[in-house]
Amino acid sequence: MSASLAFVFPGQGSQSLGMLKELGAEKPVIVETFKEASDALGYDLWKLVQEGPEEQLNQTDKTQPAILTASIALWRLWLEEGGATPAFVSGHSLGEYSALVAAGSLSLKDAVRLVERRGQLMQEAVPAGHGAMAAILGLDDAVVVEICGRAAEDEVVSAVNFNSPGQVVIAGNKAAVDRAMELCKEAGAKRALPLAVSVPSHCALMKPAAERFAENVNAIEWKAPQIPVVQNVTAAIAPDLDALKHDLLAQLYQPVRWVECVQTLAANGAVNLVECGPGKVLAGLNKRCADGVTTYNLNTPDAVAATRAALA
C-alpha cells in the first residue's frame, strides 16, 4: 500500500466511442472485465463502446455502466501488473460507484446493474427537455449559489458540481437554468456553457429518483470498504456502511464537492492521484483543487507505462 497514492474515478462525460481500444487489443483483462459486465447486463457492452451507435452510448443508462466497467478494467489491469494499492479512493459522481467496486464494497456485477438502474431512474425523474445543466466559469462559488437562489423563482436551479475553483456546474429546470446563466453572465462570468446532458443531476429534481433507487441499493450485498472512500456529499470518509449508503443515495440530489474531496485526499498525504478511467477530465480539475497534487492517467498503453514508471 502506498500512503501517498489515491485512485480517483471519473463520472459521465469521460465516455468516447472506441475508448480503451488499444489496451483492449493488448491486455486480456480489459475485454474480460467487459465480458463480465455484459453477462450481468444482458447485452454486449464492449461492442457498444467500440462500435456504437454513439447516441446509444450517450444515453445515461448505457453511459454509466460503460464508464464504470472501463474504470474497473483499468483498476484490475493496474493490480494485475503489480501496481501499488492506494491509501484512498474517490470518484466524481457516477465514479463513486467505481471507487466502491475498487474498494471491495460491492461486486462489478451488482454495480453495473445498479448504475444502469440509476440511469433509468434519473431519466424518468425529469422528462427529456425539461431539465438542463450548465458550466459556469470564472465566478466564486458563493456568487453562483446566490444567483441560483434568485433565478429559481418557483422552479429548481442549484449549484451541483464544485469541480475546481472558478468552475461550478448548475442544474435544474431548463427555464431556471437559462435565467441563472444570464444572471451569471451579468455578474461577470467568463463563460456560461449549457452542457449536452439529458438529465439535471445532483439537484432537488432527483429526490424522487433517490427514493425509488433506495430499494435497489438496499437489495444488494454490501461489504465494508477495504480502502477508505472519500465521498462526494461530505468530502469525508463515512464512519460505517449505513452512512456510506445514505451518502451515496443523497448524492443523486446533493452537490458533488469535488474540490473538497481532492483537498481531503491531499490533507491526508495522498498527493499522487491516478485517474482510473477512460478520459482525462479529472486530471484537468485536480491540479486547480489543491497545491502539490499530481494526477496520472491510465487511458492508453503509453499512459499506463508512464504512470507505472512515475510511481514505481
Identify the meaning behind each predicted range.
Residues 1-144, 195, 272-302:
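FabD-like malonyl-/acyl-CoA
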Residues 79, 185, 266-269:
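Non-catalytic positions within long, well-ordered alpha-helices that form the structural scaffold/packing
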Residues 253-270:
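A short, acidic, amphipathic alpha-helical segment used as a generic capping/interface helix at domain edges
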Residues 304-310:
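Short, charged, surface-exposed secondary-structure boundary motifs
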Residues 12-14, 41-43, 103-255, 311:
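Alpha/beta catalytic cores of group-transfer enzymes, especially the acyltransferase/condensing modules
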